[in-house]
């Protein structure tokens, strides 16, 4: 008589592996033998595939799914969502979070969300919260996290071995990272008026977008910026085809890129763009994307191209400041160029500071930050990879001296601009420092975070708002566009100070519009 089979409890990672093997065509029977489980268990895993994947995506990519065996959710799921978002934000900013602080914050959110029940943020709740999200015990001791140099060195060694083993060229190695950008954040004492709170800089998360830069180690393939805002289609986008934007735009309520958005970007944009680029270079369509350690992003196993040749690797916890390529001056350079462009735009328009600030839209910001990203030199990006690839270093790229020159030039121009005479180099230089500028602006207040969760859970559009959303967007005919272009050209011809290049651009646009109009007319006849 056969003995009773020993009960096997699979980890979430085991279940993910089984799901992957099922997709590869391996039979239920074979998997049941390999893992020592019944065929019915394998079938249950397939049945709950979506639930397992969603749970894995919300866990710590390196430890959350490798140890945990159950998928028990929180009693207060809404509170759990806002707490992990808050925790991730504190971690990203290097702000120490102790167990006491975490418990107090949970109690605050519980009250702010207007939740009902007997919740006291006990030590038991805190332990379960950490377990659910794969948060290591050391993360809650209240000491500010510093770069783990030992972990960084070990990862550099293992990553170089991986690159050699897979025979990857720098052209096939990509890095991506995100940062928050307060697109209306203007230098103090320059375009802001101390007596007017409405123009005192960025105090609201509504004036914040997330930008994600992605490029390969050569710096020769810079993908369009990924921009994430709070509104699905901001008012400034009216009449704008999102596919024509110089960036890939997504919307969400959270402070950092959420897993669903990131996965969509990876599968629908990153993979096709990389395949296209490598094909143009005559290289094998095989690549790796290096990311820092964010619990909110999908697990490594869940991110790959259909053929498995384009994959993701995560940096270990707490080494971003040391070896994440995009954090070695690339993101800071983008922000510096953006802010310089913002000031230049103000000076070119010559408007009153308050009018300029009021008229500035998120669409303006998107075009400006896209221009800033395009200005980043390939040598700057190559230099950012030097810690992972020492032999890849170049002695060029934007440095402190170049930044100082840019600040000095702008300060000189501003000092000769009405209402900005009091600006100085120190003021501009401090504003250029992405860390000091961003820290002076509130990232996402506790009340705003709770408010976003409340709106997501409770707010339903009224019949009036639904009716407004159904109104068709403004359509501009070819005839009207051609008429406006003709008028603008007439205007330019009357101006003595207009450049020939500006006139030529409009003439080229007029030709394009005429062709479109001709094609449309032929279709109608």
UniProtKB/Swiss-Prot annotation:
Residues 168-385 form the DDE-1 domain. Keywords: DNA-binding, Nucleus. GO terms for molecular function: DNA binding. Residues 67-139 form the HTH CENPB-type domain. It is found in: Nucleus. InterPro entries: CenT-Element_Derived (IPR050863), DDE_SF_endonuclease_dom (IPR004875), Homeodomain-like_sf (IPR009057), HTH_CenpB_DNA-bd_dom (IPR006600), HTH_Psq (IPR007889). Residues 1-52 form the HTH psq-type domain. GO terms for cellular component: nucleus. Residues 28-48, 100-132 bind DNA. Residues 442-474 are annotated as: Disordered. Pfam families: CENP-B_N (PF04218), DDE_1 (PF03184), HTH_Tnp_Tc5 (PF03221). Belongs to the tigger transposable element derived protein family. PANTHER family: TIGGER TRANSPOSABLE ELEMENT-DERIVED PROTEIN 2, TRANSPOSON. This is Tigger transposable element-derived protein 2. It comes from Homo sapiens (Human). The gene is TIGD2.
């Amino acid at each position: 008589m056969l003995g009773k089979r020993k009960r096997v409890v699979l980890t979430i990672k085991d279940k993910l592996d089984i799901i992957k093997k099922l997709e590869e065509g391996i039979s239920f029977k074979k998997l049941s033998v390999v893992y020592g489980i019944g065929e019915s268990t394998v079938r249950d895993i397939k049945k709950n595939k979506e639930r397992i994947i969603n749970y894995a995506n919300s866990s710590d990519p390196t430890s959350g799914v490798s140890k945990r065996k159950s998928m028990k959710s929180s009693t207060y799921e809404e509170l759990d969502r806002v707490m992990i978002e808050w925790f991730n934000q504190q971690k990203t900013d290097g702000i120490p979070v102790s167990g006491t602080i975490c418990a107090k914050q949970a109690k605050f959110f519980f009250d702010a969300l207007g939740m009902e029940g007997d919740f006291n943020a006990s030590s038991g709740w805190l332990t379960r919260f950490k377990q659910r999200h794969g948060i290591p015990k050391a993360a809650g001791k209240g000491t500010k996290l510093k770069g783990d140099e030992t972990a960084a060195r070990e990862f550099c060694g293992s990553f170089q071995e991986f690159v050699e083993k897979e025979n990857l060229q720098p052209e096939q190695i990509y890095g991506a990272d995100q940062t928050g950008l307060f697109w209306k954040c203007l230098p103090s004492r320059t375009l802001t008026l101390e007596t007017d709170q409405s123009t005192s800089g960025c105090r609201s998360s509504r004036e914040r977008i997330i930008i994600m830069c992605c490029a390969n180690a050569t710096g020769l393939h810079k993908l369009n910026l990924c921009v994430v805002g709070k509104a699905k289609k901001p008012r400034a986008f009216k009449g704008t085809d999102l596919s024509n934007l110089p960036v890939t735009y997504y919307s969400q309520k959270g402070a950092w890129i959420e897993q669903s958005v990131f996965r969509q970007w990876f599968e629908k944009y990153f993979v096709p763009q990389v395949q296209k680029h490598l094909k143009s270079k005559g290289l094998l369509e095989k690549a790796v994307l290096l990311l820092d350690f964010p619990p909110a992003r999908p697990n490594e196993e869940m991110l790959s191209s259909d053929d498995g040749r384009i994959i993701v690797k995560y940096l270990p916890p707490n080494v971003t400041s040391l070896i994440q390529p995009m954090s070695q001056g690339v993101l800071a350079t983008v922000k510096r160029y953006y802010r310089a462009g913002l000031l230049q735009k103000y000076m070119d328009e010559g408007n009153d500071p308050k009018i300029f600030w009021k008229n500035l839209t998120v669409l303006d910001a998107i075009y400006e930050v896209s221009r800033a990203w395009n200005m980043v030199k390939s040598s700057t990006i190559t230099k950012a990879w030097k810690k992972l690839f020492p032999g890849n270093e170049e002695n060029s790229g934007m440095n402190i001296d170049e930044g100082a020159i840019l600040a000095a030039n702008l300060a000189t121009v501003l000092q000769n601009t009405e209402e900005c005479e009091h600006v100085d180099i120190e003021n501009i230089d401090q504003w250029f420092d992405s860390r000091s500028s961003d820290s002076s602006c509130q990232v996402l207040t506790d009340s705003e975070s709770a408010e976003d969760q409340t709106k997501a859970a409770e707010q339903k559009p009224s019949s009036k708002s639904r009716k407004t959303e159904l109104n068709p967007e403004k359509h501009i005919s070819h005839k009207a566009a051609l008429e406006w272009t003709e008028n603008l050209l007439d205007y330019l011809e009357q101006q003595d100070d207009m450049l020939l290049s500006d006139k030529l651009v409009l003439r080229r646009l007029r030709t394009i519009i005429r062709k479109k109009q001709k094609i449309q007319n032929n279709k109608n006849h």
